[in-house]
Amino acid sequence: GTRDMVDLCEVIKRYYYNPHTQGSNSIKKVLPAVLKSSTFIQAKYAKPIESIGLGSKNFPPEQIWLEKENGEIRNPYNLLPSLYENLTQEEIETTLSELDNVNDGGAALTAYGKIQYMDMSAKERNEIGLALKRYCELDTLAMVIIYEHLKTLV
């Protein structure tokens, strides 16, 4: 049709090689590889999201997705906030989900299942929901960043 959708994973598998992915086609490996390899992407995402024309319903306007530690670019999935950053220590001790972070697909599936089927406080359920939204938003942004990078290569 006129608006066919393209699976970026297929594009990556067929046409993209980056040694920083260590042979993986996973978005969790491709995103950090792109951040390490592209000066265009580095320059753009080293700024707060509000200054590069991005809005967010789940992150503050001053969120920066490109951070370095000891000269190395950090994986943005490791920048996702702790699941219970808005809870007190006492509230954390009474949580039932036994999750720390939602920063990969397995944790996201587990978290979603737990909020569906576990009896937990509304506050814990809300925190897990927020963590899922943040994770999904970063996944979406990762696809945008990868697409932007691919556009610079053609």
Q: Can you name each region flagged by the protein language model?
A:
Residues 1-154:
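DEDD superfamily 3′-5′ metal-dependent exonuclease/proofreading module
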